[in-house]
């Protein structure tokens, strides 16, 4: 088995540096940390988590608290968990998965919280450890999220440049920052281009968007693009346009948001705004560990840009 001395030799650093990378990574430069991590990977060196926890008076556990219902039909949380777990593993940390009913079971060094809504503010405030939220919030907590406003602004500008005469926004009917930001990105670009915004909000289910298209089909002229706040909504729109014998993408365009899985099983594949879910998961892990190592010092927020991924639903 490889030892700490072996890692130090491989990375061409002192044993003290290796120990500091393992126990106090916030005190080491990123380039030096990567050298040590690379040596640890090559030698398959695993720090003794129990010894590390004892030395630091810590549990070496981060809790992931998921406050919304997880949908087993799409791997959104699988990508997020992969990013968090892989990053925590670099620092000899374990991940404990929780729901709102078992928040206080066991001890930990910090929390990553997903799916928080406004009614959860009191629950978050009562957590007695450093907290990082996955998703924009307005209660002053540190968070990681996509740049939702810029994401929809980019898609709206793309639709205009592709020559779509009418651009209809179908948002998610929820009073949360991410939903407002996405709609704002659309309305701002429409106004900047002298176009009239046309917005609707629906529950985030494909059957709702399909029913909406069916009900309003005669109101939508050819050369209309439907900009949807989720791939779920986009799938329902595509399905019903085809049901109404509309031509996609020649006469009607559709853009979704998320790019996790549903865009690939839609026919044709959706043009969508792909979020960097795994990378954002890793960023959540880095931020909460930094916060733990700095005695809860606020870390601010980090926004990730989305990628406009072209499929078969736009020209």
Annotate each language-model stretch with its function.
Residues 1-57, 315:
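N-terminal helix-turn-helix DNA-binding module of bacterial transcription factors
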Residues 2, 61-157, 216:
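Alpha-helical recognition/docking segments in bacterial nutrient-uptake
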Residues 76-90, 154, 177-196, 236-240, ...:
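Short, solvent-exposed amphipathic alpha-helices that sit
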Residues 81, 88-99, 169, 187-207, ...:
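Short beta-strand elements in bilobed, periplasmic/extracellular small-molecule ligand-binding domains
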Residues 144-170, 179-181, 188, 206-214, ...:
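Hydrophobic alpha-helical segments within soluble ligand-binding/sensing domains
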Residues 165-167, 196-197, 248-253:
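Short acidic capping loops at alpha-helix termini that bridge into adjacent secondary structure
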Residues 214-315:
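Flexible loop/turn connectors
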């Amino acid at each position: 088995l490889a030892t700490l001395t072996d890692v130090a030799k491989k990375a061409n650093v002192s044993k003290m540096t290796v120990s500091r990378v393992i126990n106090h990574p916030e005190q080491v430069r990123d380039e030096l940390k990567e050298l040590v991590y690379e040596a640890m990977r090559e030698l398959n060196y695993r720090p003794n988590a129990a010894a590390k926890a004892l030395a630091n008076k810590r549990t070496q556990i981060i809790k992931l608290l998921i406050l919304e219902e997880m949908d087993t039909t799409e791997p959104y949380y699988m990508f997020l968990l992969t990013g968090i777990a892989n990053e925590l593993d670099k620092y000899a940390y374990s991940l404990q998965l929780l729901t709102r009913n078992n928040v206080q079971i066991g001890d930990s060094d910090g929390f990553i919280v997903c799916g928080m809504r406004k009614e959860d503010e009191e629950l978050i405030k009562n957590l007695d450890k450093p907290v990082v939220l996955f998703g924009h919030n307005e209660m002053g907590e540190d968070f990681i999220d996509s740049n939702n406003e810029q994401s929809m602004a980019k898609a709206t500008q793309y639709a205009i440049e592709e020559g779509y005469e009418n651009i209809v926004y179908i948002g998610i009917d929820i009073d949360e920052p991410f939903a407002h930001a996405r709609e704002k990105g659309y309305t701002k670009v429409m106004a900047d281009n002298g176009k009239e915004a046309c917005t609707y909000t629906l529950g985030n289910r494909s059957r709702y968007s399909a029913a909406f298209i069916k009900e309003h089909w005669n109101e939508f002229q050819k050369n209309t693009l439907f900009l949807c706040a989720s791939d779920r909504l986009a799938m329902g729109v595509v399905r019903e346009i085809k049901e109404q014998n509309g031509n996609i993408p020649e006469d009607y365009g559709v853009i979704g948001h998320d790019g996790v899985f549903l865009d690939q099983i839609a026919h044709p594949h959706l043009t969508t705004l792909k979020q960097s879910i795994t990378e954002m998961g890793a960023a959540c892990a880095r931020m909460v560990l930094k916060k733990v190592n700095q005695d809860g010092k606020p870390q601010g927020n980090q926004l990730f840009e989305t990628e406009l991924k072209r499929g078969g639903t736009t020209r």
